[in-house]
Amino acid sequence: MTELELLGPRASGEPLGTAILKAVAEDFQVDEVLDIPLSGQGEHLWLWVEKRDLNTEEAARRLARAAGVPVRSISYAGLKDRQALTRQWFSLHLPGKADPDLSRAEDASLRVLKQVRHQRKLQRGAHSANGFTLRLTALAADHQAVDARLEQLRQQGVPNYFGTQRFGHGGGNVHDALDWAARKALPEQRNVRSRLLSAGRSYLFNQLLAARVADGSWARAQVGDLLAFTDSRSFFPAGEAECADPRLAILDLHPTGPMWGEGASPAGGAPAQLENAIGARQPALCQWLAQAGMDHERRILRLPIGGLTWHYPEPDILQLEFVLPAGCFATVVVREVVDLVSAGQTDSPCVF
């Protein structure tokens, strides 16, 4: 499957040129934003860890081995890409135990930058955002055009697609999800099951978002839409008054799309008709997600880009810095500016 099939059309026009992302790990830096004050005491040891070319799950295994605890005793908020320089939190459950010597886990690919005790473990999804520093190299695009496009994105946001990382190489995770759905079965391995359910659900969401990008309604509220604030998981229906809410114009409030699961969509009007039409294309997949116990949830269609700045360290290098809500993909910002030329394997099954 192509990127266009997995995601959908761009909202800002054709790409302005080409560039390479992730030529080296330092070209893709991610800093987890966690708004939790740590108490300094408790049976959980929280670790601020820097990883280079190392995925989150392998880092967790190494930390657990060094601490002498089972891997189930370590927690993290979210998965980070392997081919990157990332900094994120982990927590170790150490009831009645002293702080372990973690030096055996450290090498050029992993460093423990900080250790703090706390009463609770780190929950999955606890981080509020991720900060990104991206260096696009071998840039072949007009700087003035790039500047204008980035200013446009700063003001209007981008479609909140799930990135290709979610779907595996060539959309393999989607193919596998469709195959399991057709057989009305689930993989026995928990991590495989989770990965394929996530891929199938994300694919359906992207199909819905692609249709709204195509008709120009992705950033505009319609009567019957369900609206949500950027950092909220709650939503409310849009009538005519809500469609004129000034918070839509300043990118605080957004229309949402369905994350398919058990239960009917609460949307109404034209948005509900479109959601039903998208679901009708893949009835087996929708039923599979519901039978797997996935709840119907919502995801904002428009992704606001926080604190977007950029400069050119060299004529053929563009450096971008910005913040995105947790669960959103930096690559969907980049694709609205340039086409990415591969400098090796840049996709991974991880989500930021």
UniProtKB/Swiss-Prot annotation:
One Gene Ontology CC term in the entry: cytosol
Uppermost EC category: isomerase
Top-rank taxon, per record: Bacteria
Active-site residues, record numbering mapped to chain: 81 (nucleophile)
Entry's Gene Ontology molecular function annotations: RNA binding; tRNA pseudouridine(13) synthase activity
EC number(s) from the headed UniProt entry: 5.4.99.27
Pfam families named in the record: TruD
Reactions catalysed, as given in the entry: uridine(13) in tRNA = pseudouridine(13) in tRNA
Keyword Ion transport: no
UniProt KW keywords: Isomerase, tRNA processing
GO process terms (BP): tRNA pseudouridine synthesis
Domain TRUD: from-to ranges: 157-303
Matching HAMAP family: TruD
Record function comment: Responsible for synthesis of pseudouridine from uracil-13 in transfer RNAs.
Matching NCBIfam families: PRK00984.1-2
Family: Belongs to the pseudouridine synthase TruD family.
Protein name (record): tRNA pseudouridine synthase D
Lineage of the organism: Bacteria, Pseudomonadati, Pseudomonadota, Gammaproteobacteria, Pseudomonadales
Gene: truD
